[in-house]
């Protein structure tokens, strides 16, 4: 029995309609920006395997550090115990975040990092005896698939079956010059009810790589600060260089109260989540009353092996060569965007840092379930490229180690698709 047959017999894949989806492709190894299937075919990973891989697949330095950790300590309970990797990772991450970030709370992935942030905000007010339970979020947001994360995400196919069960959220448009005054008024009118404002800084990933200007986010954040509304920056996707800076929040002068990280945190090696917060939020949980404890944790909280992977990734991320690669990819994206911007099939194009998105002209058919999505996905797979269009939106989000030749190959195949499809 083939690996595909064995898979289809026992596996339920994510975001996949198992009755109609094409069979999965068995991958046996990865190297650099590429993965290889069981027949030896190479695929350039143009989406960093769901936006997680930043240094390349099977990176020898990360693999070495993970292997070393496995022979020392694979796991230890994190309630009442600690270990070097967790402490060092928290120290090093906090050192490169906004200065107001003082504490790190570990969890298992991006969704759980968001859950922790939501709980911190809600209980912050609860511990002070204040009833502020409403959340503020952007329309079309995506923050994860656990229930709290779904609640603060825009209502869509991802949440449709559960909408009646999700807690109340006030959704607002992305800020622009035209609507910023109205958005600020909405916040002022709700300030006594709002627990927090959660946002994806500069880029809404799953919504279709929707991008907005830092100056209007900064103005919105300043207004939240004036109205004592806590802020959660979801840097799960945008963090670790994706937007051209180390973190997207570096584009604004205002600082969030809470920040959430995952995806690139371990270089894409394994799952790990971190939620950081200010001293003021941490202090709101200090009490002789044990009911004011943050009652949240995971079996694999601060797993030493995942921390080792994250520390190794941090070493690589802070190297000058990584920043140079980010700038190189950014410049190449800009050149390609200019080249295709007037093509009749390109409705819009947008780019921030290493993220390049192009909206294919499809008239009114812009659904996430657009048939064009499957056509393009299969077209690029046949060419040895992994691109997963979001409906009619093609985006490129490669590992930072991708070569110029590999990027140019992707660009060339997109141009070819524009002529053939």
Label every PLM stretch briefly.
Residues 1-421:
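Conserved N-terminal phosphate-binding loop of PLP-dependent enzymes in the Aspartate aminotransferase
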């Amino acid at each position: 029995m083939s690996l595909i047959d064995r898979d289809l017999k026992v596996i339920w894949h994510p975001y996949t309609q198992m009755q109609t989806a094409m069979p999965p492709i068995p991958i046996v190894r990865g190297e650099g920006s590429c993965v290889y299937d069981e027949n030896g075919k190479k695929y350039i990973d143009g989406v960093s395997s769901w936006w997680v891989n930043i240094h390349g697949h099977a990176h020898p330095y990360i693999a070495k550090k993970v292997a070393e950790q496995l022979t020392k300590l694979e796991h230890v309970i994190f309630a009442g115990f600690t270990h070097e990797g967790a402490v060092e990772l928290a120290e090093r991450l906090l050192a490169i975040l906004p200065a107001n970030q003082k504490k790190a709370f570990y969890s298992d992935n991006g969704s759980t990092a968001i859950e922790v942030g939501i709980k911190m905000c809600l209980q912050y007010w609860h511990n002070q005896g204040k009833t502020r339970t409403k959340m503020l979020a952007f329309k079309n947001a995506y923050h994860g698939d656990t229930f709290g994360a779904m609640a603060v995400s825009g209502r869509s196919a991802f949440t449709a079956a559960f909408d009646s069960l999700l807690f109340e959220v006030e959704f607002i448009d992305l800020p622009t010059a035209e609507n910023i005054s109205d958005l600020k008024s909405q916040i002022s009118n709700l300030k006594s009810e709002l627990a927090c404002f959660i946002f994806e800084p500069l880029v809404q990933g799953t919504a279709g790589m929707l991008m907005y200007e830092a100056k209007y986010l900064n103005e919105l954040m300043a207004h939240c600060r004036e109205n004592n509304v806590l802020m959660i920056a979801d840097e799960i996707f945008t963090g670790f260089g994706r937007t051209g800076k180390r973190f997207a929040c570096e584009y604004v002068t205002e600082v969030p109260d809470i920040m959430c990280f995952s995806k690139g945190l371990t270089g894409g090696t394994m799952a790990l989540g971190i939620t950081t917060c200010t001293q003021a939020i941490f202090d709101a949980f200090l009490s002789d009353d044990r009911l004011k404890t943050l009652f949240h944790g995971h079996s694999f909280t601060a797993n030493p092996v995942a921390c080792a992977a994250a520390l190794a990734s941090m070493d690589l991320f802070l190297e000058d060569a990584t920043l140079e690669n980010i700038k190189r990819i950014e410049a190449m994206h800009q050149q390609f965007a200019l080249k295709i911007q007037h093509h009749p099939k390109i409705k819009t194009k947008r780019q921030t840092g290493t993220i390049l998105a192009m909206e294919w002209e499809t008239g009114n058919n812009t659904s996430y379930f657009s048939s064009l999505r499957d056509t393009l996905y299969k077209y690029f797979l046949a060419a040895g490229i992994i691109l997963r269009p979001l409906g009619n939106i093609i985006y490129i989000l490669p590992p930072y180690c991708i070569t110029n030749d590999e990027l140019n190959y992707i660009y060339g195949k997109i141009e070819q698709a524009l002529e053939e499809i």
